[in-house]
Amino acid sequence: MAANNEDAANYLAADEQFEDEAYDSPSPTTSTSYATSIQSYIREGVEENGRKYPSYGRNLYGLPIDEEEQERNEVQHTKFKLIIGDRLHLAPVRQLPSNILDLGTGSGIWAIEAADKYESAIVTGVDIAPVQPTWIPANCRFEVLDIEDNWMFAENSFDYIHARELIMAIRDWDRLIKQAYDHLRPGAYLELGATYPTPTSDDGSLRPDMYLKEVERLFFEMAEAMNASLHAPTLWKEKMERAGFVDVRQNIFK
């Protein structure tokens, strides 16, 4: 779940209070016009069957981005914290980190709580949908970014990269993990988390003919049709090690 990087990478984008050390340096004019041009249509999204879906990103994303989904996202956040002992993460973040990145930040709740916890750091949450709140800690920011594209951050810049529940969003995990590796400072950590969508029961009471198992089958079928493998978490450790991470640890909870 967490991995240590021996050979790493630089990052950030600042508001007026903070020094920008994380972005590669596009001109201010280019950055501003880009942000303005994408903002109008990505905020609206695409409506389908009464739900709102993202209109930005190179690949189809199968989950909505509306208010109902943001509420589910926050319940999911609470679930993760309870599972790992009321913590935000398992990886050992260095003292006084300066830059933290949250991939696929969703409602932004993890990034906001991380910014409150690590006041020394600028915590940046990125997502294809700008659905995050505007009232946030001064050291927290949100950016629109498709993390399957090239990242616009300088290499060797992050003290910690966090990603959770991205199995419906990522097609090329090798590329994502390698980009994370390249953007981490030496000794920094990447932490990936996901719910493996295969319900089981210790006592055998969950039979193959039950509706819950049918939901599982349809979920996997849908994901495969989108070319998003739900089996990805079982391969993360191997992919991290192949990218160059060391001290890779896998934690399984039920």
Give residue ranges: language-model regions:
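A generic structural signal for alpha->beta connector loops
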Residues: 120, 139, 187, 245-247
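Voltage-sensor-like transmembrane helices and their cytoplasmic interface
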Residues: 122, 130, 162-165, 188
